[in-house]
């Protein structure tokens, strides 16, 4: 199994999309790319820690490649808006790829170039080495699955899931 860490707005959105993808073993919402140790949601939302809301994805590279994970990333958020996704505004919502290896860095940079062909505005996604990943509090994990009737889930997360379903990427079978 390999890992990928990505930030593209609220971690609930990326978590919900990647949990559907065949070859993804687990998705953990958390914080990365900041300056303080052991951040919590309140401190991250204050903007003082420098962390981004991210997801750490454990995947089977025999089923899905890192490059394919990045392709899903580009359709799951707007990488052209700085420190913002829709109404979610702040440094914690920035688009970022904290890479785990030099090979991931290379693929991230190639993926940005390829994705840039599909956006009219420049991509502002940061690419930097993952120094530390801190899992978010338990109530943030599996958010869409445990709160499907919550308004944010209905109006923000569900459209991103629907967009993913239209791509033709493989979706996990029910119960897997």
Swiss-Prot record:
UniProt keyword list: Oxidoreductase
One Pfam family this sequence matches: PMSR
UniProt key word Ubl conjugation: no
Enzyme Commission no: 1.8.4.11
GO biological process: protein modification process
Signal peptide start and end residues: none
Catalytic activity of the protein: L-methionyl-[protein] + [thioredoxin]-disulfide + H2O = L-methionyl-(S)-S-oxide-[protein] + [thioredoxin]-dithiol; [thioredoxin]-disulfide + L-methionine + H2O = L-methionine (S)-S-oxide + [thioredoxin]-dithiol
Protein family according to the UniProt entry: Belongs to the MsrA Met sulfoxide reductase family.
Function summary: Has an important function as a repair enzyme for proteins that have been inactivated by oxidation. Catalyzes the reversible oxidation-reduction of methionine sulfoxide in proteins to methionine.
Protein name: Peptide methionine sulfoxide reductase MsrA
Organism: Leptospira borgpetersenii serovar Hardjo-bovis (strain L550)
């Amino acid at each position: 199994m390999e890992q990928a860490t990505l930030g593209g707005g609220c971690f609930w959105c990326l978590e919900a999309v990647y949990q559907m993808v065949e070859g993804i073993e687990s998705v953990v919402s958390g914080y990365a790319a900041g300056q303080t140790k052991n951040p919590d949601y309140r401190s991250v939302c204050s903007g003082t820690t420098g962390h981004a809301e991210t997801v750490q994805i454990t995947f089977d590279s025999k089923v899905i490649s890192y490059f394919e994970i990045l392709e899903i990333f580009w359709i799951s958020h707007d990488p052209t808006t700085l420190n913002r996704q829709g109404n979610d505004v702040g440094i914690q919502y920035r688009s970022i790829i904290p890479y785990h290896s030099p090979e991931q860095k290379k693929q991230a940079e190639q993926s940005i170039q390829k994705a840039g062909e599909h956006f009219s505005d420049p991509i502002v996604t940061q690419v930097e080495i993952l120094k530390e990943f801190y899992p978010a509090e338990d109530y943030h994990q599996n958010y869409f699955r445990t709160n499907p009737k919550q308004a944010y889930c209905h109006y923000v997360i569900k459209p991103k899931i629907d967009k993913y379903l239209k791509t033709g990427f493989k979706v996990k079978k029910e119960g897997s």
